[in-house]
Amino acid sequence: MAVVIRLQGLPIVAGTMDIRHFFSGLTIPDGGVHIVGGELGEAFIVFATDEDARLGMMRTGGTIKGSKVTLLLSSKTEMQNMIELSRRRFETANLDIPPANASRSGPPPSSGMSSRVNLPAIVPNFNNPSPSVVTATTSVHESNKNIQTFSTASVGTAPPSMGTSFGSPTFSSTIPSTASPMNTVPPPPIPPIPAMPSLPPLPSIPPIPVPPPVPTLPPVPPVPPIPPVPSVPPMTTLPPMSGMPPLNPPPVAPLPAGMNGSGAPIGLNNNMNPVFLGPLNPVNSIQMNSQSSVKSLPINPDDLYVSVHGMPFSAMENDVREFFHGLRVDAVHLLKDHVGRNNGNGLVKFLSPQDTFEALKRNRMLMIQRYVEVSPATERQWVAAGGHITFKQSMGPSGQAHPPPQTLPRSKSPSGQKRSRSRSPHEAGFCVYLKGLPFEAENKHVIDFFKKLDIVEDSIYIAYGPNGKATGEGFVEFRNDADYKAALCRHKQYMGNRFIQVHPITKKGMLEKIDMIRKRLQNFSYDQRELVLNPEGEVSSAKVCAHITNIPFSITKMDVLQFLEGIPVDESAVHVLVDNNGQGLGQALVQFKTEDDAHKSEHLHRKKLNGREAFVHIVTLEDMREIEKNPPAQGKKGLKISVPGNPAVPVIPSAGMPAAGIPTAGIPGAGLPSAGMPGAGMPSSGMPGPGMPGPGIPGAGIPGPAMPGPAMPGPAMPGPAMPGPAMPGPAMPGPAMPGPAMPGPAIPGPAIPGPAIPGAGIPSAGGEEHVFLTVGSKEANNGPPFNFPGNFGGPNAFGPPLPPPGLGGAFGDVRPVMPSVGNSGLPGLGLEVPGFGGAPNNISGPSGFGGIPQNFGNGPGSLNAPPGFGSGPPGLGSVPGHLSGPPAFGPGPGPGPIHIGGPPGFGASSGKPGPTIIKVQNMPFTVSIDEILDFFYGYQVIPGSVCLKYNEKGMPTGEAMVAFESRDEATAAVIDLNDRPIGSRKVKLVLG
C-alpha cells in the first residue's frame, strides 16, 4: 500500500534526484516525488510500502543541500489538493500579479481589459501587424475613449530591442487566449444593434478595402509622444522580479508558491506570464541598472561565494574559471596545505547571487579529470581562507566597478567594517590573538611567522607565567586591514613543530587580556613564590616536584597529564627527559604548584602508565634541576660510591655475603677452615666450597700488615662436620665459595711473613669490611704467585655446566687453570693438580717453606674433591678475577695469579666481567625480538644475542635467552625488570 509523506524545508536548489538520494535505500516508485515549493519548501513523496514510509519518517531532521527538512505523514488527498492549489496559484498569478506598468496612470482594473493580458497580443504583431489586428486595435481605441493610453502604453512597453523574441511562434498559444477577451471588450458598441434592419446595405462593405485602414496607420506613429513611458523605472513592485536571476526565481520574494524553482523548470510553454521572462532578454540589463537606484532588496554577501571540493591537485585558477565558464567570476582562491601545496579545495567569489546560483548547478561535474563538489560558502570562510587577495579590491574604490548588488551591503554606512562575520575587526585596531606558541618563542620568531606583513612597532606581546616560562599565548597588532586579513590566513600554520592558532581580537579585548595576565602575575601569592625561591634567592627545599621513572620511552606530555588527572598541573610544568638523539629516557619531571599537590602524586606510585608501573618520587626543585641536567640511567639501582683504590666501582646493595654486594641470600659452601697466617693480626674466614668427605682443608687467610707472629687459626665456616683432622696448608684468600660448609679442627700453619695483599677481603674478626669487587686484575698481579690446588680427583667429581651451545667463543669454558704448586717436599695428602700427578701422602706447597718443619704427620691416603674446584661458572668472562698471594708463596719470584670462581650465577670476580646470560620465561608466544629489546631498553644487551626458544614442532615456548655485556648489567636487569609485563604476561628473569 502506497504511503504519502509530506516534506517541508526543501531548499530552492534541490530537485527530485536530491530527494531520492536523501531517501536512498527506500523504494519510491517512478513519479512518486512531487515538489510543490511554496514558502515552506514543500514536497510530497509516495513510498511503495508501509515499511519504506516508516523508515523514511525516521530520517526527519536530516539535511538536503544543507537545509534541514521535516517529514510529516500525509495522504494522497492532501497531496492532490496541495498540487491543485499550487497549480491554481500559478495560473492566477498570470492574471492577478500587478503588471510592470500598473503604477502608471490608466484605467482601473475593472475596465475589463488588463494591459498585461493584451501585451502579448499586441507586442508579437508589432513588427509585422496584420490588418485584422490593426482593425481590432483601432476599434478598441474608438469604442473605449477612456483607454487612451492602452495602445500606446502597451506598444511602449515593447522596445525595438526585443527583436523577434516576442514574435516567436511560441506565443501563438497565448494569442488566442488573450484575443478572446479582446472580443469581449467591444460590447459597448453593441447597443446600436437595434438598427440591425439597416443590414441590407452591408453589401457595400466589400468595397471597403482592408488596405484603407493601413493608411490609417500613420496616425499610429503618434505613439512617439509616449515619452511618459520613462516613468516605468519608478515601479516598486518590479525590483524583486528584475533582480531575479536568469533561471533563479527563488530570490524573488513576491513569487507565488510553485514558482520557487523546486517545481518544473521555467519554459515558454508552461503558461508562465512572459513578464517573468524579462531577465532572459536584453531588457534585463536595463532593469538591473534601474534597480541600482532601488535599495529595497539588499544582497547577502554570503550569496556571492561557493566552495569547491575535490579538485585535481594540479588545478590552477584558470582551470577553475574555465569550469565556471559563462559565469562572472570575481576571484578564485585555491587552498593549500601547511607545505604550500594545493589540497584540492578552493573558494570562488562571483559578481552576483545569480552567478552563484548557476555555479551551484555544476555540482559533481567534471573538472579536468575529477568530479568536483560545489557547495555554498560564506564570506567568513572566504576571509579565513585568504580571500584578502581580492577582498580589499572589492571593498575599495575599485569595487564600484563591480555591479551594485555587490557593493550595496558594504557601502550602506560608514561602519562598513562591522560585518556579520566574527573573524573581522570591530574597530580600527587590527589585532590578532596567538595560541600555541612554542615556549621558547621570541619576538623574532613571531616576526618571521608573519613575514612580509606590516606589524606595528613594539606591538608583539608574549605572555609569561609565574614560573617565568612562556604560556604559549601572544598578541600582535598590524598596521592595515590587508595585512590583518593575511595574518588571519596563517591560522593553524606551523612555527617550528607546533601549529599556531591565529584568532581575531579587538584592541580593547587585547589590552584587557594583557592586563589580566599582568594582574595574575602580580597576584601570584608570596607563599607560592616561596615554593620556588626563598628570600635570599636560593632554591627552596620544599618538595614541589616529582620524578617519574620506569615509564615507556615513547611517553608524551599528554600521557603524563592524563596520568596526573585530578592534580592541577600546567602543561608547561611537565618535562619529558630525552637523550641527545631525542629518544625518550622513560623518565619525566613534573613541577606542582603546591607541596600538597606533590604529595597527592605519591598516591600514583606504581600505578600503570601506558602498561608499565610508574615510580613517583617527590624531589625538591634543586633536585629536579640536577636530574634535568644529568638524568640518571634508567633501571640502575646501584649508586656510584667512592671506594679507595677504585672510586668508580658500583656497589650493588643486597643481603648477601658480607661486603660482597651480591644480591642473594647466604650461599652455602664447603667451609675450608683457614689457618691464620703470621702477621695477619686477624684470621679470615675459611673458604667455603662444595662438601667433601674427609677432614676439612684449611685455607689461607688474607694477611694484614706483615708482622711476624704465631699463626692464629681462623674460624671455620658453618656446615656439616666431616670427621678427620684438618690438614695444614696455606690459607686461601678470597670470597667464600658456595656449597655446604665442612668445618674441621684448624691446624695452625707455618708463619709466613709478608706484606698485606691490597684489595678485596672478607670480614675479619675485627669487623672491618672491604668490598671485594674493587680489586682489579692489574692490582692482583702485583704480588708473587699463590699456588692453590685446583683439580681434586674423585668419583664425585663435578663441574659447572657448560655454556649454552651456539653462543660463540665469548661464552667458552672459562674454568681457571690452576698453576703448578711445585715440589715443596711437604708431606701430606696427595692432591691432583692440572697437568701434574700428585703422589699419595704428598702435598705440594710453596718452595718458600724450606726452613720450616714440613711433616705434619700422616693423613688419609687421599682426599677426593670435585674436579675443577675453585673454577667459576660459565659466563664469568674470558678473564677471571685474580687475587695475589703473599710473597714467596710460589715456586719462583714471578707473579702467579690465583683464579677464584664465584658461586654459580654470580660474578664474584673483579676486573672486566664477561658476558652474562639471562633466561626470560613466561613471555607471550607472539613476542618478537624487537619487543624483547624494547623491554630491556637502557640495558647493555649484546646486539644479536636474543635467542627465542622453540619446541620440537617449531612453535614458540615463550622463553628466550638474552646476553648482556657484563654481570652487573644482567643483575640490574633481573632486579629491576623481573615480574614486569611484556604484553599481558609478567615475565620471569633467571640469571644464567
Swiss-Prot record:
Pfam families, per database record: RRM_1
Any one GO MF annotation of this record: RNA binding
Coiled coil segments of this chain: none
InterPro entries documented for this protein: ESRP (IPR050666), Nucleotide-bd_a/b_plait_sf (IPR012677), RBD_domain_sf (IPR035979), RBM12_RRM1 (IPR034591), RBM12_RRM2 (IPR034594), RBM12_RRM3 (IPR034855), RBM12_RRM4 (IPR034856), RBM12_RRM5 (IPR034854)
Residue positions, PTM Phosphoserine: S352, S375, S420, S422, S424, S525
Domain RRM: 304-379, 430-507, 916-992
Biased segments, Polar residues type: 408-417
GO cellular component terms attached to this protein's record: nucleus
Disordered: region residues: 393-424, 849-913
Keyword Calcium belongs to the record: no
Keyword annotations from UniProtKB, A to Z: Nucleus, Phosphoprotein, Repeat, RNA-binding
Ranges of compositional bias, category Low complexity: 876-887
Domain of life per record: Eukaryota
Cysteines joined through disulfide linkages: none
Entry's localization field: Nucleus
The name this protein goes by in its record: RNA-binding protein 12
